[in-house]
Amino acid sequence: MEQRVLCAGRSQQIMDSVLIALRDAGYDAEGAVTIDAAVEMAARGAYDALLVGGGITGDDRAELIERVQAIQPHIALAFADGGPHTALTVLRAALGDGPTS
């Protein structure tokens, strides 16, 4: 079964690249480019991890995490602060060995 990943960032272009990479690696990944949209997605379905992009920082990052964890308290957290090329690495670290497919 694919692990479900909720990705949150600011840039749709970067988000699209990250989603392609995660899906190619076997994850069921969905993305949002606003905090409200990410929270709405978390409320609609269970996710194994929340991947937060480097564009969401400071108080916005704290708000996103707080709101998502209020809905899904056991969600794993991963932070792709180094750009899209780090997303897969940090996600695998947060989840363990990665997707099981």
Where are these regions (language model features)?
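Short hydrophobic/Thr-rich beta-strand motif most characteristic of the beta2 strand and flanking loop
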Residues: 26-33
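Acidic, metal-coordinating helix/loop segments flanking the phosphotransfer/catalytic sites
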Residues: 33-47
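Ser/Thr/Gly-rich flexible loops in soluble cytosolic domains mediating phosphotransfer, phosphorylation
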Residues: 70-101
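Conserved phosphotransfer microenvironments
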Residues: 52-67
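Conserved N-terminal glycine/acidic-rich loop preference
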Residues: 35-36, 55, 87-91
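Alpha-helical interaction/dimerization surfaces of two-component signaling modules
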Residues: 21-22
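Conserved acidic segment of CheY-like receiver
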Residues: 2-11, 18, 50
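Structural motif
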Residues: 8-12, 53-55, 80-82
